[in-house]
């Protein structure tokens, strides 16, 4: 049976890993990805609505995203929302769809994105280590209170450390994949 503290640590670390993966997906790279539009909201009848709930977003050609709204009346609203965002892309509205052409990024831009990805992953590592510290503290408290013997406490601490190492390694792998994606032409 898995100890509840180990289970708690694993669940929290897994959530942290998923959060970091989601943040990296939303990051702009040289390739177009519908995920970068997830944070862009359009004022649709007074309600801030994500673009992906108002349109079909697809990748067309090598460096183009095509946004095809289900209701053509929102074309200009989507265009304004993209212009107001910090994506640095110029939407082209042809009356039916909006095209977002991704320019080939410079080496300097790519290096900046890699640096940003590294910062995001570092935040994840810090969160994982904080989870480890929190669980280790609970193990020590349980041991002090006499709820678990010293040998079991040491075994649990080793398990928590092993989990920590495992998740930090996964974060490093996620970073390497993102770095490769950013740097490839």
UniProtKB/Swiss-Prot annotation:
Pfam families: RRF (PF01765). Responsible for the release of ribosomes from messenger RNA at the termination of protein biosynthesis. May increase the efficiency of translation by recycling ribosomes from one round of translation to another. One of its GO terms (cellular component) is cytoplasm. This is Ribosome-recycling factor. One of its GO terms (biological process) is translational termination. Belongs to the RRF family. Keywords: Cytoplasm, Protein biosynthesis. It is found in: Cytoplasm. Its main location: cytoplasm. HAMAP family: RRF. GO terms for molecular function: ribosomal large subunit binding. Gene3D superfamilies: 3.30.1360.40, Ribosome-recycling factor. It comes from Thermotoga neapolitana (strain ATCC 49049 / DSM 4359 / NBRC 107923 / NS-E). The gene is frr.
């Amino acid at each position: 049976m898995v100890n509840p503290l180990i289970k708690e640590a694993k669940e929290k670390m897994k959530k942290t890993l998923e959060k970091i993966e989601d943040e990296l997906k939303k990051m702009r790279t040289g390739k177009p990805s519908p995920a970068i539009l997830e944070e862009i909201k359009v004022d649709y009848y007074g309600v801030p609505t994500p673009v992906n709930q108002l349109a079909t977003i697809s990748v067309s050609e090598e460096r183009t995203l095509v946004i095809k709204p289900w209701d053509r009346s929102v074309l200009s609203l989507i265009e304004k929302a993209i212009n107001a965002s910090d994506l640095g892309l110029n939407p082209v509205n042809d009356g039916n769809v909006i095209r977002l052409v991704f320019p080939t990024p410079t080496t300097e831009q790519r290096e900046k994105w890699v640096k940003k990805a590294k910062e995001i992953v570092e935040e994840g590592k810090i969160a994982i280590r904080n989870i480890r510290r929190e669980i280790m503290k609970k193990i020590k408290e349980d041991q002090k209170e006499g709820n678990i013997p010293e040998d079991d406490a040491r075994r649990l601490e080793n398990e928590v450390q092993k989990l920590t190492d495992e998740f930090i390694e996964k974060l490093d792998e996620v970073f390497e994949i993102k770095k490769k994606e950013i740097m490839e032409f």
